[in-house]
Design a protein with these regions (language model features):
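Start-transfer (signal-anchor) and selected internal transmembrane alpha helices
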Residues: 1-58, 258-264, 343, 349-359
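Membrane-embedded helix bundles of polyisoprenyl
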Residues: 47, 53, 137-156, 160-244, ...
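Periplasmic/ER-lumenal interhelical loops and adjacent helix-loop junctions
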Residues: 71-87, 256, 263-264, 269-344, ...
């Protein structure tokens, strides 16, 4: 037997699709009572304290931040933060930067420029630097995401506020979320997703549609990948719900459509130009690199523990993946608990059935093009092999579909706590509490490891570079031709406030066939230097190679060539550059320099 619609939901207004869904979700639902204000305050304090705990290593090294498992994206997002300040200080185009990838620039709209956060944080970046702003983004993102799910759960889904507290706790601090702290603030900041999902399900008026359109617009400037996943999850949820309650869904189609037009009109008007710029503007591209589309989830990863969890912190990377993409490392105890919830509430909770299907669909998509078990391919054609050639699907990293399981499990956990609170069996209440502790304690979040970044050469921090680089020319740092070196190069430019244009860097841009790729297409000089970096072979430079170098310098509008002592095969690179330029290097603070202004003229 199903419970009546709670009084609190009845006060929201005319029953909507969302209210009907909630009505079916709790046969033993606790009596809905207004959440006390002190509970809301306690939730914020708890979530903020946990967020500070997770990011404590970053705060300790705030003056020279480097995430141990951060990879490449930390450098890009610090770049994006400074780019946002240049919108105000230099009138730079928010959607495009000429300072990276000289002479072509970078399409920031096509690179997750995170304008929805970097622009509001511009004062923080200007006053305290990009490392502080980056850490604020991560700390605030964890807190806000947990609180957003708590708010939606406590106001609209469950009647027992501790159930919402548990749901919000998992939604904000699940292993997948904490792992994204290793470099993806766009994926950590999911605070709009619960409101978008709720508004989409309960859409019934033009006013609702306008609000949803504004939320969608903001989310598009945070992360479009999450927006696509949210829309897909809502579609699957409603489709499954319609199978069990077709009459209810049919009755709400017309009110939904009356709000949908307002959503499309609002979001369409606000996003028309940014989306055009993203897909057809300068340095736009189509799809992700092939190597990224191959990133799938190993089946065994679901039962494994993440590096960011209590039981595995400090351990070596798992053979099933590593930070920051341990999106589905839930651990076997939690999977067992979720299975018990589904069995317990399946027959009486329509929403549990729909959520279970959503979880299975997204878990399957996260497997990627091929299905692997323990690192071994067991199925050559996985679920994504059927979809990754389609628009939108070709722009999603497959393993990140697993992030959608986090809010699904969070809602199921909230349902279970809410249901346990209503039972008259004390053994069930206490027993279920022990089950949740056993399932959640092993995956409790652990601080993300951080360390001090390598110092920036004094040549850049002192401003000495100004003597060599006119405003219309660029700097070619040899390190940028190899993967890790491109991050170093961006850090050096960040230290100057992106005051000069740099060659190369870490970003997504077009190859000649317009497909997406990391970094620019390689020029002949870059190919020559990469070969030395990889193999360390000494090379006697030919006249043709010198001519290609001069052509590349002119193409880049490079004023100087800089080599860091930290570059692999430093001596061989120095020797080759001496030959290419026809002159020995100048030693400047922290680096070697070749003045090539006479070659680029």
């Amino acid at each position: 037997m199903e419970a009546p619609l709670p009084d609190r939901l009845a006060r929201v207004g005319t029953p909507s699709a969302a209210q009907a869904i909630v009505q079916q979700t709790a046969p033993e639902r606790s009596a809905a009572r207004p959440t006390p204000r002190w509970a809301d305050a306690a939730a914020v304090v708890l979530y903020l304290a946990l967020a500070c705990w997770v990011t404590s290593g970053l705060w300790r090294h705030i003056d020279a931040l480097a995430l141990v498992n951060g990879g490449s994206d930390v450098h890009f997002f610090e770049w994006a933060l400074i780019h946002a300040t240049r919108i105000f200080t230099h009138g730079e185009n928010p959607l495009f930067t000429p300072q990276l990838n000289a002479p072509n620039g970078v399409n920031m709209m096509a690179n997750t420029g995170l304008l929805g956060l970097t622009v509001p944080l511009a004062p923080v970046t200007l006053l305290f630097g990009p490392a502080v702003a980056f850490t604020v983004m991560l700390t605030g993102g964890l807190t806000a995401t947990a609180w957003a799910w708590y708010h939606v759960l406590s106001r609209h889904i469950v009647g027992y506020w501790p159930a919402a507290l548990v749901g919000g706790l998992f939604a904000g601090f699940a292993p997948g979320m904490v792992n994204q702290v290793n470099g993806h603030p766009d994926l950590v900041n999911q605070f709009l997703i619960p409101f978008i999902v709720w508004r989409a399900i309960s859409l019934r008026t033009a006013r609702d549609g306008v609000v949803l359109g504004l939320l969608v617009t903001w989310q598009a400037f945070l992360n479009e990948e999450l927006l696509f996943q949210a829309g897909l999850a809502v579609a699957v949820f409603v489709a499954v719900y319609a199978v069990f309650r077709p009459a209810e869904v049919r009755a709400r189609v017309r009110p939904f459509l009356s709000g949908l037009w307002a959503t499309l009109l609002t979001a369409g008007a606000l996003l028309a130009y940014p989306l055009w710029f993203q897909f057809y503007g300068p340095q736009s591209y189509r799809g992700l690199p092939e190597i990224v589309l191959g990133y799938g989830t190993d089946v065994r990863a679901f039962a494994a523990f993440a590096q960011s969890s209590l039981v595995r912190h400090g351990a070596s990377h798992s053979s099933y993946g590593g930070p920051p993409e341990e999106n589905t490392f839930f651990g076997a105890p939690l999977l067992i608990a979720v299975g018990l919830i589904v069995v317990w509430l399946w027959r009486r909770h329509v929403a549990v059935r729909a959520l279970t299907v959503v979880a299975l669909v997204f878990a399957a998509l996260s497997l990627g093009r091929t299905v692997k078990v323990g690192g071994h391919t067991v199925l050559q054609h996985g679920p994504m092999s059927l979809l990754d050639h389609l628009q939108l699907f070709d722009s999603v990293v497959p393993t990140r579909f697993g992030l959608a399981l986090v809010p699904v499990i969070a809602i199921l956990l909230a349902f279970s706590v809410d249901a346990a609170a209503t039972t008259s069996h004390a053994w069930l209440r206490y027993g279920w509490t022990l089950v949740l502790v056993a399932a959640l304690l092993p995956i409790a979040p652990w601080p993300v490891p951080a360390e001090r970044a390598a110092p920036v050469p004094g040549f850049f921090t002192s401003g000495q570079w100004h003597q060599y680089v006119p405003d219309d020319e660029s700097v070619f740092v040899v390190n940028s031709v190899f993967w890790v070196g491109s991050f170093t190069t961006m850090d050096w430019d960040n230290a100057t406030g992106q005051a000069y244009r740099m060659v190369g860097g870490y970003f997504l841009g077009p190859f000649p066939d317009a497909s997406g790729n990391y970094g620019p297409p390689l020029r002949p000089t870059a190919e020559l230097l990469i070969n030395i970096v990889q193999y360390g072979a000494s090379t006697r430079i030919t006249a043709a190679q010198r001519a290609a170098f001069r052509a590349d310098v002119r193409y880049w509008h490079a004023a100087i060539v800089v080599l860091s002592p930290a570059a692999p095969h430093y001596d061989q690179l120095r020797n080759v550059l001496d030959q290419l330029t026809g002159r020995p290097a100048q030693r400047v603070p922290g680096a070697l320099l070749w003045d090539v202004r006479t070659l680029s003229g």
